[in-house]
Protein backbone atom coordinates (compact mmCIF):
# COMPACT_ATOMS: atom_id res chain seq x y z
CA UNK A 1 0.00 0.00 0.00
CA UNK A 2 1.16 3.54 -0.64
CA UNK A 3 -0.03 6.74 1.01
CA UNK A 4 1.29 10.03 2.29
CA UNK A 5 2.98 10.39 5.70
CA UNK A 6 -0.24 11.30 7.48
CA UNK A 7 -0.62 11.21 11.26
CA UNK A 8 -3.84 9.19 10.85
CA UNK A 9 -1.86 6.54 8.94
CA UNK A 10 1.10 6.48 11.32
CA UNK A 11 0.08 3.32 13.18
CA UNK A 12 -0.24 1.48 9.86
CA UNK A 13 3.06 2.86 8.63
CA UNK A 14 5.04 1.85 11.72
CA UNK A 15 3.26 -1.50 12.05
CA UNK A 16 1.52 -0.79 15.37
CA UNK A 17 -1.75 -1.62 13.58
CA UNK A 18 -1.94 -4.51 11.12
CA UNK A 19 -4.99 -5.40 9.02
CA UNK A 20 -6.32 -8.81 9.98
CA UNK A 21 -5.27 -11.57 7.59
CA UNK A 22 -3.05 -9.29 5.50
CA UNK A 23 0.73 -9.04 5.40
CA UNK A 24 0.80 -5.32 4.62
CA UNK A 25 3.85 -3.41 3.47
CA UNK A 26 3.36 0.36 3.50
CA UNK A 27 5.44 2.61 1.30
CA UNK A 28 5.24 6.25 2.32
CA UNK A 29 5.40 8.70 -0.54
CA UNK A 30 4.98 12.42 -0.04
CA UNK A 31 5.74 13.54 -3.60
CA UNK A 32 2.90 15.33 -5.42
CA UNK A 33 2.82 12.58 -8.06
CA UNK A 34 2.30 9.74 -5.60
CA UNK A 35 -1.35 9.37 -6.60
CA UNK A 36 -0.40 8.34 -10.13
CA UNK A 37 1.11 5.12 -8.81
CA UNK A 38 -2.13 3.20 -9.36
CA UNK A 39 -1.92 3.79 -13.10
CA UNK A 40 0.86 1.23 -13.33
CA UNK A 41 -0.99 -1.14 -10.95
CA UNK A 42 2.15 -1.05 -8.80
CA UNK A 43 0.28 -1.24 -5.49
CA UNK A 44 -2.56 -3.36 -4.16
CA UNK A 45 -3.94 -0.33 -2.30
CA UNK A 46 -3.33 3.38 -2.67
CA UNK A 47 -4.78 6.78 -1.93
CA UNK A 48 -6.10 8.44 -5.07
CA UNK A 49 -7.90 11.54 -6.31
CA UNK A 50 -11.59 11.07 -5.56
CA UNK A 51 -12.73 13.23 -8.48
CA UNK A 52 -10.78 11.18 -11.01
CA UNK A 53 -12.05 7.94 -9.48
CA UNK A 54 -15.64 9.20 -9.79
CA UNK A 55 -15.03 10.18 -13.42
CA UNK A 56 -13.93 6.58 -14.01
CA UNK A 57 -17.03 4.98 -12.44
CA UNK A 58 -18.59 4.59 -15.90
CA UNK A 59 -15.42 3.46 -17.70
CA UNK A 60 -13.78 1.36 -14.94
CA UNK A 61 -10.36 1.69 -16.54
CA UNK A 62 -8.42 2.21 -13.30
CA UNK A 63 -8.88 -1.34 -12.07
CA UNK A 64 -9.39 -0.26 -8.46
CA UNK A 65 -12.37 -0.18 -6.08
CA UNK A 66 -12.88 2.41 -3.34
CA UNK A 67 -13.63 1.84 0.32
CA UNK A 68 -14.98 4.72 2.48
CA UNK A 69 -11.61 5.64 3.95
CA UNK A 70 -11.11 9.27 2.97
CA UNK A 71 -7.38 9.49 3.38
CA UNK A 72 -7.25 13.24 2.90
CA UNK A 73 -9.82 15.95 3.61
CA UNK A 74 -9.31 19.70 3.35
CA UNK A 75 -11.38 22.83 3.30
CA UNK A 76 -10.67 24.77 0.12
CA UNK A 77 -11.76 28.33 0.96
CA UNK A 78 -8.10 29.23 1.53
CA UNK A 79 -6.91 27.73 -1.76
CA UNK A 80 -8.72 30.15 -4.06
CA UNK A 81 -6.45 33.06 -4.93
CA UNK A 82 -6.90 36.27 -6.90
CA UNK A 83 -4.69 38.80 -8.61
CA UNK A 84 -5.11 42.04 -6.68
CA UNK A 85 -5.42 44.02 -9.91
CA UNK A 86 -8.15 41.82 -11.41
CA UNK A 87 -11.01 43.75 -9.84
CA UNK A 88 -12.23 40.76 -7.84
CA UNK A 89 -13.63 42.20 -4.62
CA UNK A 90 -16.11 39.41 -3.94
CA UNK A 91 -16.77 35.88 -5.27
CA UNK A 92 -19.49 37.20 -7.58
CA UNK A 93 -16.84 39.19 -9.44
CA UNK A 94 -15.38 35.92 -10.74
CA UNK A 95 -18.16 35.56 -13.32
CA UNK A 96 -16.71 36.16 -16.78
CA UNK A 97 -13.13 35.98 -15.51
CA UNK A 98 -10.19 33.71 -16.35
CA UNK A 99 -9.63 31.16 -13.58
CA UNK A 100 -6.76 28.69 -13.38
CA UNK A 101 -7.09 25.06 -12.32
CA UNK A 102 -4.47 22.33 -12.40
CA UNK A 103 -6.79 19.81 -14.03
CA UNK A 104 -10.55 19.87 -14.54
CA UNK A 105 -10.92 16.53 -12.71
CA UNK A 106 -8.91 17.52 -9.64
CA UNK A 107 -11.00 17.07 -6.50
CA UNK A 108 -9.78 20.38 -5.10
CA UNK A 109 -11.24 22.16 -8.12
CA UNK A 110 -14.48 20.15 -8.02
CA UNK A 111 -15.20 21.21 -4.43
CA UNK A 112 -14.09 24.81 -4.97
CA UNK A 113 -16.23 25.24 -8.09
CA UNK A 114 -19.20 23.67 -6.31
CA UNK A 115 -18.69 25.92 -3.30
CA UNK A 116 -18.47 29.04 -5.46
CA UNK A 117 -21.57 28.07 -7.42
CA UNK A 118 -23.75 26.99 -4.48
CA UNK A 119 -22.74 29.62 -1.95
CA UNK A 120 -21.75 32.63 -4.05
CA UNK A 121 -23.56 32.38 -7.38
CA UNK A 122 -20.66 31.60 -9.70
CA UNK A 123 -21.77 30.59 -13.20
CA UNK A 124 -19.07 28.11 -14.36
CA UNK A 125 -20.22 28.54 -17.96
CA UNK A 126 -19.32 32.24 -17.87
CA UNK A 127 -15.72 31.53 -16.89
CA UNK A 128 -12.77 30.77 -19.14
CA UNK A 129 -10.88 28.03 -17.34
CA UNK A 130 -7.11 27.82 -17.75
CA UNK A 131 -5.65 24.37 -17.04
CA UNK A 132 -2.28 22.64 -17.15
CA UNK A 133 -4.02 19.61 -18.60
CA UNK A 134 -7.41 18.02 -19.09
CA UNK A 135 -6.41 14.46 -18.41
CA UNK A 136 -9.37 12.15 -18.31
CA UNK A 137 -10.19 8.49 -17.97
CA UNK A 138 -11.53 6.09 -20.56
CA UNK A 139 -13.26 8.00 -23.34
CA UNK A 140 -14.05 10.98 -21.10
CA UNK A 141 -14.34 14.28 -22.92
CA UNK A 142 -14.87 17.78 -21.48
CA UNK A 143 -18.53 18.91 -21.56
CA UNK A 144 -19.56 20.97 -24.58
CA UNK A 145 -20.28 24.07 -22.47
CA UNK A 146 -16.80 24.17 -20.95
CA UNK A 147 -14.59 27.03 -22.11
CA UNK A 148 -11.10 25.78 -21.35
CA UNK A 149 -7.62 26.70 -22.50
CA UNK A 150 -4.59 24.48 -21.96
CA UNK A 151 -1.31 26.18 -21.15
CA UNK A 152 2.13 24.56 -21.07
CA UNK A 153 2.76 23.19 -17.59
CA UNK A 154 6.12 24.94 -17.41
CA UNK A 155 4.32 28.30 -17.40
CA UNK A 156 3.03 27.48 -13.92
CA UNK A 157 -0.31 28.72 -12.62
CA UNK A 158 1.44 30.77 -9.93
CA UNK A 159 3.29 32.84 -12.54
CA UNK A 160 0.16 33.23 -14.67
CA UNK A 161 -1.71 34.63 -11.67
CA UNK A 162 1.13 36.85 -10.49
CA UNK A 163 1.51 38.33 -13.98
CA UNK A 164 -2.23 38.89 -14.46
CA UNK A 165 -2.62 36.39 -17.30
CA UNK A 166 -5.37 34.82 -15.20
CA UNK A 167 -7.56 36.63 -12.69
CA UNK A 168 -7.88 33.86 -10.10
CA UNK A 169 -6.68 30.33 -9.44
CA UNK A 170 -7.83 27.24 -7.59
CA UNK A 171 -4.82 25.28 -6.45
CA UNK A 172 -3.34 23.05 -3.77
CA UNK A 173 -0.45 25.45 -3.16
CA UNK A 174 -0.07 27.92 -0.30
CA UNK A 175 0.31 31.13 -2.32
CA UNK A 176 -0.75 33.63 0.32
CA UNK A 177 -0.31 35.56 2.48
CA UNK A 178 2.91 37.42 1.77
CA UNK A 179 4.17 35.06 -0.95
CA UNK A 180 3.79 37.51 -3.85
CA UNK A 181 2.69 41.17 -3.71
CA UNK A 182 0.10 40.70 -6.48
CA UNK A 183 -1.55 37.55 -5.05
CA UNK A 184 -4.11 37.43 -2.25
CA UNK A 185 -6.83 35.17 -0.88
CA UNK A 186 -10.30 35.39 -2.37
CA UNK A 187 -11.44 34.81 1.22
CA UNK A 188 -9.00 36.50 3.64
CA UNK A 189 -11.29 35.43 6.52
CA UNK A 190 -11.24 31.82 5.34
CA UNK A 191 -10.97 30.28 8.81
CA UNK A 192 -14.27 31.81 9.96
CA UNK A 193 -15.95 30.89 6.67
CA UNK A 194 -14.75 27.29 6.93
CA UNK A 195 -16.14 26.99 10.45
CA UNK A 196 -19.47 28.40 9.31
CA UNK A 197 -19.55 26.11 6.28
CA UNK A 198 -18.86 23.06 8.45
CA UNK A 199 -21.53 24.02 10.98
CA UNK A 200 -24.13 24.45 8.23
CA UNK A 201 -23.29 21.48 6.01
CA UNK A 202 -21.33 19.05 8.16
CA UNK A 203 -18.92 18.70 5.22
CA UNK A 204 -15.15 18.50 5.63
CA UNK A 205 -14.39 18.11 1.91
CA UNK A 206 -13.14 14.72 0.77
CA UNK A 207 -10.00 14.92 -1.38
CA UNK A 208 -8.38 11.47 -1.55
CA UNK A 209 -9.95 8.05 -1.07
CA UNK A 210 -8.36 4.66 -0.46
CA UNK A 211 -8.57 2.31 -3.43
CA UNK A 212 -7.90 -1.42 -3.52
CA UNK A 213 -7.20 -3.42 -6.66
CA UNK A 214 -10.50 -4.74 -7.98
CA UNK A 215 -8.89 -8.09 -8.76
CA UNK A 216 -7.91 -8.43 -5.09
CA UNK A 217 -11.36 -7.69 -3.63
CA UNK A 218 -13.06 -9.85 -6.27
CA UNK A 219 -10.90 -12.80 -5.24
CA UNK A 220 -10.99 -12.05 -1.49
CA UNK A 221 -13.91 -9.71 -0.66
CA UNK A 222 -13.02 -9.73 3.04
CA UNK A 223 -9.89 -7.66 2.29
CA UNK A 224 -11.98 -4.50 1.86
CA UNK A 225 -13.41 -4.66 5.38
CA UNK A 226 -10.09 -5.72 6.91
CA UNK A 227 -8.38 -2.68 5.42
CA UNK A 228 -11.25 -0.45 6.50
CA UNK A 229 -11.06 -1.67 10.11
CA UNK A 230 -7.28 -1.24 10.21
CA UNK A 231 -7.45 2.34 9.00
CA UNK A 232 -10.11 3.12 11.60
CA UNK A 233 -7.89 1.69 14.33
CA UNK A 234 -4.95 3.74 13.09
CA UNK A 235 -7.06 6.90 13.18
CA UNK A 236 -8.15 6.10 16.74
CA UNK A 237 -4.51 5.97 17.82
CA UNK A 238 -3.93 9.27 16.02
CA UNK A 239 -6.72 10.91 18.02
CA UNK A 240 -5.18 9.60 21.25
CA UNK A 241 -1.84 11.12 20.25
CA UNK A 242 -3.41 14.48 19.34
CA UNK A 243 -5.17 14.64 22.71
CA UNK A 244 -1.88 13.98 24.49
CA UNK A 245 -0.22 16.62 22.33
CA UNK A 246 -2.56 19.39 23.46
CA UNK A 247 -0.38 19.97 26.53
CA UNK A 248 2.95 18.96 24.96
CA UNK A 249 2.77 20.42 21.44
CA UNK A 250 5.38 23.00 20.41
CA UNK A 251 2.71 25.19 18.79
CA UNK A 252 1.70 28.17 20.92
CA UNK A 253 -2.10 27.83 20.81
CA UNK A 254 -2.52 24.19 19.87
CA UNK A 255 -4.55 23.36 22.99
CA UNK A 256 -7.08 26.13 22.35
CA UNK A 257 -7.45 25.14 18.69
CA UNK A 258 -7.79 21.45 19.55
CA UNK A 259 -10.48 22.18 22.14
CA UNK A 260 -12.33 24.50 19.74
CA UNK A 261 -12.27 21.78 17.08
CA UNK A 262 -13.67 19.27 19.55
CA UNK A 263 -16.48 21.67 20.44
CA UNK A 264 -17.42 22.33 16.81
CA UNK A 265 -16.75 18.96 15.16
CA UNK A 266 -16.92 16.44 18.00
CA UNK A 267 -14.53 13.67 18.89
CA UNK A 268 -14.35 12.20 15.36
CA UNK A 269 -13.94 15.12 12.96
CA UNK A 270 -12.18 13.02 10.30
CA UNK A 271 -15.19 10.89 9.46
CA UNK A 272 -14.81 7.61 7.60
CA UNK A 273 -17.40 4.94 6.88
CA UNK A 274 -20.37 4.96 4.52
CA UNK A 275 -23.48 5.82 6.51
CA UNK A 276 -22.36 9.01 8.24
CA UNK A 277 -20.60 10.35 5.16
CA UNK A 278 -23.28 9.49 2.60
CA UNK A 279 -24.67 13.07 2.35
CA UNK A 280 -21.21 14.47 1.70
CA UNK A 281 -20.36 11.78 -0.86
CA UNK A 282 -23.70 12.45 -2.54
CA UNK A 283 -22.90 16.17 -2.80
CA UNK A 284 -19.52 15.39 -4.34
CA UNK A 285 -21.17 13.08 -6.88
CA UNK A 286 -23.67 15.84 -7.65
CA UNK A 287 -20.85 18.31 -8.25
CA UNK A 288 -19.05 15.84 -10.50
CA UNK A 289 -22.17 15.42 -12.62
CA UNK A 290 -22.92 19.16 -12.80
CA UNK A 291 -19.35 19.88 -13.82
CA UNK A 292 -19.27 17.24 -16.53
CA UNK A 293 -17.00 14.68 -14.90
CA UNK A 294 -19.79 12.11 -15.25
CA UNK A 295 -22.60 11.79 -17.78
CA UNK A 296 -25.08 10.87 -15.06
CA UNK A 297 -25.41 11.41 -11.34
CA UNK A 298 -24.08 8.28 -9.60
CA UNK A 299 -25.42 7.16 -6.23
CA UNK A 300 -23.02 6.82 -3.26
CA UNK A 301 -23.72 3.07 -3.10
CA UNK A 302 -22.18 2.70 -6.58
CA UNK A 303 -18.88 4.14 -5.46
CA UNK A 304 -17.68 1.64 -2.85
CA UNK A 305 -17.10 -2.05 -2.33
CA UNK A 306 -20.41 -3.62 -1.21
CA UNK A 307 -18.93 -5.04 2.00
CA UNK A 308 -18.31 -1.51 3.31
CA UNK A 309 -21.81 -0.12 2.81
CA UNK A 310 -22.81 -1.10 6.36
CA UNK A 311 -19.98 0.89 7.92
Provide a role label for each language-model segment:
Residues 87-89, 118-126, 159-167, 219:
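Secondary-structure boundary elements
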Residues 144-242:
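Pocket-lining segment of extracytoplasmic ligand-binding domains
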Residues 211, 217-290:
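Secondary-structure end/capping motifs
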Residues 282-311:
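Short hairpin/turn module used for nucleic-acid contact or packing/dimerization
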